[in-house]
Amino acid sequence: MSFKSQSIGIIGAPFSKGQPRGGVEEGPTALRKAGLLEKLKEQECDVKDYGDLCFADVPNDTPFQIVKNPRSVGKANQQLADVVAEIKKNGRTSLVLGGDHSMAIGSISGHARVHPDLCVIWVDAHTDINTPLTTTTGNLHGQPVSFLLKELKEKIPEVPGLSWVTPCLSAKDIVYIGLRDVDPAEHYILKTLGIKYFSMIEVDKLGIGKVMEEAFSYLLGRKKRPIHLSFDVDGLDPFFTPATGTPVHGGLSYREGIYITEEIYKTGLLSGLDIMEVNPSLGKTPEEVTRTVNTAVALVLACFGVAREGNHKPIDYLKPPK
């Protein structure tokens, strides 16, 4: 594979209040400790580290109906959106280290401020498209897409802390891969809006190669545009990423996950990346934590050109002997 260096802006989003399980705020630290930045630099990437966001406690963050921590989630996402927009204005690919998946609201909103024509590939066991009125858990990490879709604008009530969010995606701008745990209301939304998805049924039937071909044809067929990849590590089977909050059996294999990211790299269009829901507290053993973190790191590296076939710099390695 040919070698092209890229400039990346990394921002940690150590946030956990979009869901009930502590520990996911440790995700960014775990990914950094695993040498992610050094490995990207080895790949000749120009890496600028924007550090980790600090999230102040929001007092009196009472539920909105059953939606939990709405002001905390809203404020954290506003902070993240501002930094992602800055990274994009500087011409870098944004890399968000989560943190729970509610932070995709800020990541994609900030990205869309600078590249309003972006499209989204969402790799996840779940659609995360419940609205504040359809959610059965009240956890905002199961709702980010509903806040981002223009077609759902009229279905979203005024949630305290989230009134700043302006929907920036149309239903035709997103493709899901890896779905296998979809609520009835979410399935209704997918079908009613005609959202393109490849559940594990389609992955099994078509194979991951055809899935990626069809996803690119659907999103990029008419016009090449920036890709935002939002990757929840629970998209992979829990064998590969056990340390995560909502694991679902029968997921993507390690190889399928890496293939997705390799193919996105090859388009040359990756403009924003989220790697979400790594929760070091939820590994049953230290090895499970290491396995999850190392898998997440490998997914990120493949997005930036680390290829299983190998690669090389554009130099002549076969100079004749002197």
Curated annotation (Swiss-Prot):
GO MF terms listed in the record are:
arginase activity; manganese ion binding
EC numbers on record: 3.5.3.1
Which Pfam families does its entry note?
A: Arginase (PF00491)
What PROSITE patterns would the database entry show? Answer: ARGINASE_1 (PS01053), ARGINASE_2 (PS51409)
**What does UniProt give as GO cellular component?**
cytoplasm; cytosol
> How many cofactors are bound and how?
Binds 2 manganese ions per subunit.
PTM N6-succinyllysine: list the residues: 17, 75
Binding positions for substrate? Answer: 126-130, 137-139, 183, 246, 277
What pathway is it annotated to?
A: Nitrogen metabolism; urea cycle; L-ornithine and urea from L-arginine: step 1/1
Indicate whether Transcription regulation appears among the record's keywords: no
If you read the UniProt record, what top EC class would you report for this enzyme, in one word? hydrolase
Q: Record's InterPro entries?
A: Arginase (IPR014033), Ureohydrolase (IPR006035), Ureohydrolase_dom_sf (IPR023696), Ureohydrolase_Mn_BS (IPR020855)
**Domain of life the protein comes from:** Eukaryota
Q: Gene3D superfamilies attached here?
A: Ureohydrolase domain (3.40.800.10)
Q: Which UniProt keywords apply?
A: Arginine metabolism, Cytoplasm, Hydrolase, Manganese, Metal-binding, Phosphoprotein, Urea cycle
Give the start-end ranges of region Disordered.
1-27
Report if keyword Hydrolase is assigned.
Answer: yes
Task: List cofactor names only.
Answer: Mn(2+)
Q: Which residues are recorded as binding Mn(2+) 2? A: 124, 126, 232, 234
Q: Which family does it belong to?
A: Belongs to the arginase family.
Q: How does it assemble?
A: Homotrimer. Interacts with CMTM6.
User: What is this protein called in UniProt?
Assistant: Arginase-1
- This chain's source organism reads Sus scrofa
Phylogenetic lineage: Eukaryota, Metazoa, Chordata, Craniata, Vertebrata
